[in-house]
Amino acid sequence: MTCYVNKIRTYKNFPIKGINYLDLNGIYLDNSSRDHLVEDCIQKIHPFLESFDYFGLIEARGFLVGSILADRLNKGIVQLRNKLGRLPDETKKVDHELEYGKAQLEVQTGSGSVL
């Protein structure tokens, strides 16, 4: 884990005062760091592989690493959008809390068992 932690930059008081934004771009730019992050995630997820069919990827940060995980673990992807109204067909909305407020995620119905 330590090989990529030093690639994370922290921006204090962003996007609002009292919140520290963790910028993962340093990990994304370095292939070795990105690979170590993905391998660490796989180790943590491995005991649960049989309990879900899809990775639920929250835009936009979740799309990057989640796509790699889904590919390596032979799982599908379900998009969880935080900008409502961007998915066609029937959807469900789920309330959730952020560090600085409340929000909703939207997912298409019939998406199966999602982690």
Protein language model annotation of sequence segments:
Residues 60-62, 83:
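Short glycine-rich anion-binding loops that position phosphate/pyrophosphate groups of nucleotides
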Residues 1-51, 108:
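Active-site-facing substrate-recognition patch
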Residues 7, 62-63:
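Generic non-transmembrane alpha-helix signal with a bias for helix starts/N-cap capping motifs
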Residues 50, 73-75:
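Short glycine/proline-enriched coil/turn segments at helix->beta-strand junctions
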Residues 64-73:
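Short Gly/Thr/Asp-enriched flexible loops that form oxyanion-binding sites at enzyme active sites
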Residues 75-115:
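Short, glycine/charge-rich flexible loops or terminal/linker lids adjacent to PRPP-binding catalytic cores
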Residues 50-59:
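Short glycine-rich phosphate-binding loop at a beta-alpha junction
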